[in-house]
Design a protein with these regions (language model features):
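Short, basic phosphate-binding NTP loop
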Residues: 1-26, 30-31
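Generic structural signal for well-ordered, non-membrane alpha-helical segments
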Residues: 2, 124, 249-252
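Conserved protein kinase catalytic domain
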Residues: 6, 10, 228, 240-243
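Structural signal for interior beta-strand "rungs" in well-ordered beta-sheet cores
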Residues: 22-235
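Long, leucine- and charge-enriched amphipathic alpha-helices
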Residues: 233-264
């Protein structure tokens, strides 16, 4: 497997600078926070009360670590990351810049006048071991239960994962994909770039599902395989003609079905 060999070899050349001091003097560490003596805490990091930070953790500058967060051993958190209260992060995880984990889920209840009232989001986000989150990833906390990201999941830049989602082990989610609250993704799935997942009621994927780029998934998938719904590009004039034909499919189908059957 040459590609795997390349991946392993490339890690030997990765440069990770070591700061001159373990905890920058501008960092703010709250009461009862338990920070391992091997952890590296960058400039202007805020660590709130009751946080637990494991062995060999690196937190870069301007991060906010909320009350009660637990960060496992050897986690690497890049600059400007926000972990809301009670987030649980496993061992050997990586979170890249600008990601926000544990923000309130998007839940509102309308009244008889069409006004929307917020639903308190009382759960948390639980992230397993060896999870990698790209830059600008947003994962909302659960409404009652937790949002769960299992071991080995890899998430590309600018992905949104809604409240109470559950992503199975070793699933890959590519850039700009988004999933509505309550979505359940099985193990070893591949969600390609720009995929949107959401419909009437929560969507569920079985294990080993691949969804190609720009697909819109509106119903659950219970058979492993590759699924597509995005339309590939074509010359603009041809695309317009095809779009017009698509809008007339119902009419054309009725005409075909209404024709008398030939006797032969």
């Amino acid at each position: 497997n040459p590609y795997l060999a390349y991946a392993v070899a490339s890690q030997l050349f990765e440069h990770r600078p070591v700061p001159a001091q373990k905890i920058h003097p501008s960092a703010i560490i709250g009461n009862n926070a338990n920070v391992h003596n091997s952890a590296i805490i960058g400039a202007h990091v805020v660590i709130e009360d009751g946080v637990e930070i494991g062995e060999g953790v690196s937190i870069s500058h301007n991060c906010s670590i909320g009350r009660g967060v637990k960060i496992g051993d050897r986690a690497r958190i890049s600059s400007n990351v926000v972990l809301y209260p009670d987030v649980l992060l496993g061992n050997d995880c990586e979170i890249n810049s600008g990601s926000v984990i544990g923000s309130p889920g998007f839940g509102f209840a309308p009244d008889e006048h069409g006004k929307f009232h917020p639903i308190a989001q009382l759960g948390a986000v639980v992230i397993g071991n060896k999870v990698r989150l790209g830059a600008g990833v947003t994962i909302d906390r659960g409404a009652l239960g937790n949002t769960v990201i299992e071991d080995g999941v890899k998430v590309d830049d600018q992905v949104h994962i809604g409240h109470n989602c559950h992503v199975g082990e070793d699933t890959i989610i590519c850039g700009c994909a988004g999933m509505a609250g309550g979505t359940v993704i099985g193990k070893n799935c591949v969600i390609a770039g720009g995929v949107g997942i959401g419909g009437k009621g929560p969507i569920t994927f079985c294990d080993s599902v691949t969804v190609t780029a720009m697909s819109a998934i509106r119903k659950s998938i219970d058979i492993p395989g590759t699924y597509s719904s995005g339309t590939a590009q074509s010359e603009h004039g041809k695309w317009l003609r095809n779009a017009l034909s698509f809008n007339r499919l119902g009419e054309l189908t009725k005409k075909i079905l209404s024709r008398p059957k030939s006797k032969g």
